[in-house]
């Protein structure tokens, strides 16, 4: 509706230019917003105020000229009024609102989608947890966020690839290998003083048991270096397979898994450093190599290669992001834990050093999750240092509830996740409240058929939808494409969970006040069934884009 109104306003301005009532000139960006109070109309624009200086007229005078041109010029507009210093308020015809229902029915599963992305290639890299232990609930929030952002961008017409970056090159892999080897020796009877720096979780014992089952005592007879290398590879592979399975159980499948080690094996770290040196962006000081991140606004330059010749994580990130853009992505999006916020300026510096615009890299920061049970905080880790895993949470509350709860707040704000609330089958549970709205609509259709009323939508009399409840529900449906687009370009899937709760609320309010199946009024019955058909489409589409099911029975 906003886009239609913008087009109408633009046509009106151009008409004023053509007839001389306004002096021809540049048309500003036309802002159309929903007023805070319903009495001020359905929409408002400040375009007259924006044009006043150019036109050398008072804003209200410009508004009066535009209102005269727009009045009666569109089948959208019921009436217009000028408010305050020059705002133009629009009251939309009920018939225009009702036409949204025809659009929804025609679009079906595509309702809400757009082509604003124009096929632009986008990569969303998320989760990317070290293959040194199972995913915890913090990873779960990042997983839900990254997957939902990728789906939103796809729905907005972008060509999206999901990628997992495997951090398999670094000291953590040696630590994993040593942890596995020591647990293996312990299982075979050696007395081991297990270091605190090693991975403490019971999953390391599982890896060791697996090795004993398959290989017996073979690795008691090899050098420590070879034993560490073996358990680093075996442990990493097993853990990564477990991570992949947990993510699949959570409804997430990656298009590509990218190994950090491959950057070294294929010489990409070396060539990236050489490219930056050739550009004068990497210099040597005190035996180390430094990137001139201060050239791009960072607070200090950053080490790429230490004086002992060992590369930093930053070196890998330079090579990795260089590789991403070399693969043809126009827009690269990284989903990180909020504790990495200090890393943002240096990576933006890299992107600019590669000759790209800083905006070609989008970074989503995901804050911590606090677990609750009936409002009481739950211990997030055991004495051995094991965090509550994503698998444990999904097994307890289910995939749908977990995904919805992870997406209920802005990703950069802390999230309270109440396990008992997530399982509750009541209106207090937001995911139940939303899914029940969809199931309830399907139940209404079943009831209609049981009463001999077969829904037929070929010639629905939409003008019969006249009550405030009817029209309020229609208006809420009409904003879904705008919500979807805003969620995509701003990386904010919580906009969809908010919208779903509002739409479910509008539906439940409508149903409590309105009779849907009225045998003595068959045309009104068909109109209201058509309205609910459109609500069901919108609920399902919005849930689907978040990776959540829309059950027909509950």
Curated annotation (Swiss-Prot):
Keywords on record: Aminoacyl-tRNA synthetase, ATP-binding, Cytoplasm, Ligase, Nucleotide-binding, Protein biosynthesis
A molecular function (GO) term: arginine-tRNA ligase activity
One GO term (biological process): arginyl-tRNA aminoacylation
SMART domains: Arg_tRNA_synt_N (SM01016), DALR_1 (SM00836)
EC code(s) of this entry: 6.1.1.19
Motif ('HIGH' region): 129-139
Acyltransferase as UniProt keyword: no
Protein's UniProt keywords contain Transferase: no
Catalyses which reaction(s): tRNA(Arg) + L-arginine + ATP = L-arginyl-tRNA(Arg) + AMP + diphosphate
Disulfide bond positions: none
Quaternary structure, from the entry: Monomer.
PANTHER family in the cross-refs: ARGININE--TRNA LIGASE, CYTOPLASMIC, ARGINYL-TRNA SYNTHETASE
Name of the protein in its database record: Arginine--tRNA ligase
Organism name: Citrifermentans bemidjiense (strain ATCC BAA-1014 / DSM 16622 / JCM 12645 / Bem)
Gene responsible for this protein: argS
